[in-house]
Amino acid sequence: VSIANVSHAHFINEEDVYEMIDLNKNQIVGSEIININIADIEKKIEADSTVLSSEVYFTVDDVLHINVVERTPIVRIVAKDKTFYVDANGCSIPISRSGSARVIVASGEYTAENKKVLTEVRQLVDNIRNDEVLLPMIEQIYVTPNHNFILVSKVGPARIEFGDMDNCERKFQYLKTFYRADKVREMWHMYKSVSLKYKNQIVCTKI
């Protein structure tokens, strides 16, 4: 059994795979090829929410290979009623005791059933993780009671008031301009928050 894991979170192991297919290693070893249903094994493995894809095949020397690709989480959802990961396709991945992924955390005042908020969170995360300036800076998203967003920065002003999703791309452009400005970097310690909520401007609040 081979398990490919891009995020290094290790949600599943070899024994988990055998549990998915309702077999143990001893049942497979020594079995006749004709008695092993490859398509059925793949179907059972891919039914697991942690699995993106699988490939099951026999080599010429009659050795069964099971290759599994895990889903890659991009954000950890910490809703009021539930905690789980979400991948780039919007699929939920349960929290595992086997390992945790180092991804952006989205917490706050929302429930796991609020699809609109989850979609907007994923849109924010996609913008952050695909940008070389933003990715090393933003570590958390907080959802306010009125479902606006606050970004938590690792460096500089910790609180970034993003507001709603209107003009999302433009707000991120302003934020990147802010991060890149040399004069701003020299004065980071003087500010506690940055607001992008107002049209065509950045408003900074001093400590």
Give the predicted meaning of each segment:
Residues 52-53, 63, 72-75, 93-94, ...:
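Short beta-strands and strand-coil junctions in structured, solvent-facing domains, enriched
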Residues 162-207:
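Extracytoplasmic/luminal low-complexity segments enriched in Pro/Gly and acidic/polar residues
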Residues 66-145:
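Extracytoplasmic segments of membrane-associated envelope/inner-membrane machinery
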Residues 2-5, 66-72, 97, 107-110, ...:
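Flexible glycine-/small-residue-rich
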Residues 47-62, 133:
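Short, well-structured beta-strand/strand-turn elements
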Residues 12, 36, 59-63, 80-81, ...:
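Extracytoplasmic
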Residues 5-49, 97-123, 163, 173, ...:
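Periplasmic/extracytosolic POTRA-like scaffold domains at the N-termini of outer-membrane
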